[in-house]
Swiss-Prot record:
The gene is rpmB. GO terms for molecular function: structural constituent of ribosome. NCBIfam families: L28. It comes from Leptospira interrogans serogroup Icterohaemorrhagiae serovar Lai (strain 56601). One of its GO terms (cellular component) is ribosome. It holds the Pfam family Ribosomal_L28. SUPFAM superfamilies: L28p-like. Residues 11-20 have a biased composition (Polar residues). This is Large ribosomal subunit protein bL28. One of its GO terms (biological process) is translation. InterPro entries: Ribosomal_bL28, Ribosomal_bL28/bL31-like_sf, Ribosomal_bL28_bact-type, Ribosomal_bL28_sf. Residues 1-21 are annotated as: Disordered. Keywords: Ribonucleoprotein, Ribosomal protein.
Length: 94
C-alpha cells in the first residue's frame, strides 16, 4: 500500500537539500498520514481511511463526501472493503 492520502491523493515528493556551499543531495518529504474511523450517517456505518492531517482539517470543515468530490476523488474510498479482516493464508498441504 502506497503512502498516499485516500481523500486528496497527496503522496511522497522528492527534491534537494541544499547546503551552505550549494551542494545538492536528494531527499524525500513524506506526507503526514493517519488512520481515521469516520461515521457515515446516511449509511449508518463506520469506515476507516488513511488521510493526511491537512485532509482531516478539510474533512471537519466540509464533510467527508464534499471533501472527496472537491479533490476529484472517487467515493469508492468509502465502499465496504470486500475482503476486510481476511488475511492471506498458505494452502494447507495434505
Amino acid at each position: 500500500m502506497a503512502r498516499r492520502c485516500e481523500v486528496t491523493g497527496r503522496g511522497t515528493v522528492s527534491g534537494n537539500n541544499v547546503s551552505h556551499s550549494h551542494i545538492k543531495t536528494r531527499r524525500t518529504w513524506k506526507v503526514n498520514l493517519i488512520k481515521k474511523r469516520i461515521f457515515l450517517e446516511d449509511e449508518n456505518r463506520w469506515v476507516t481511511i488513511r488521510l493526511s492531517t491537512r485532509a482531516l482539517r478539510t474533512l471537519r470543515k466540509k464533510g467527508i463526501k464534499a471533501a472527496i468530490k472537491d479533490n476529484g476523488g472517487s467515493l469508492g474510498v468509502l465502499a465496504p472493503k470486500k475482503y476486510a479482516g481476511i488475511t492471506k493464508q498458505a494452502p494447507k498441504k495434505a
